[in-house]
Amino acid sequence: MKKYIFGLMAVAAAMFMASCSADEGTEPGGDSKAYVMTNTYSVAPPLDADADFKVRVSTNSATESAYILLEKHADYSKHIAELGQEGYNDFVVKNGGLVKGVKGQSEVDTLFYGLKGDYMATVVAVNAKGQAQAADSVSFTGITWNKVCDGKYKFCAAIADIMGKESVDCELDVDANNPSSYRIKDVYGHGYNLKFRKAKLTSTDEEGNAFNYIIVPKFSTGLTYKTLGTLYMADAYSFTGSEDYLDNGIYADNSLFIYTVYSVSKGAISQP
């Protein structure tokens, strides 16, 4: 079991300028009908988890081949309505791509890249007679990010030592379809973005400046700390679950502050 121990806590400021049969077909050997099951998995850098996704195709011993078709969700719904499920299965075989590596009991991953919006991927299993006998679909939503501005992210001392620099130039982006969802792009390296959500709750700092509270869920920075493994970051509120530690905010000029917690899965970095 992994253990997540309260590690280093520090305040990091990111200053931005505003200018910017039920079981049949599921077991190996002797299956009478082709069967397919699909699952999706998140991808890791250098792939982009906001726009790239992986489909795992699992088939049984009666499956001779499998075909996959990726469509916009609206097109998928239209084709299902027009053709029905069986007709759509034939449509996938005719218009989709052959899943390479599928023959009999198989487990194969297929990657899709650079998607924006809502998509459906459908896989159809075909038997040795060329009959489409089973289908399964999975959905994926690719995020469109709009640039807000350029800025500089400042690391706390311990992380600056690991990064080899005190700050990094970066950009602040907002989700085109969710104005409360933000990311600081590539802050810990290519593909390692710091994402946060703007809360409705507001407050003022000691100087009377108004800000919106923000929430930073736990994520992997892609960094390692000595022999303790992968370094994770979250805000103190997300890490503890206590509102006593909610101390993150974004101002109208897009400058922001985060009460950060860095932790590892094999032990503590240091005690606060």
Model-derived features: positions:
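C-terminal motif of bacterial Sec signal peptides marking the signal peptidase cleavage site
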Residues: F16-S19
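Acidic/polar, low-complexity intrinsically disordered N-terminal segments immediately downstream
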Residues: S21-M120, V126-D161
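Positively charged n-region of N-terminal signal peptides that target proteins for export
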Residues: M1-Y4
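Ser/Thr/Gly/Pro-rich, low-complexity flexible regions
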Residues: G142-P272
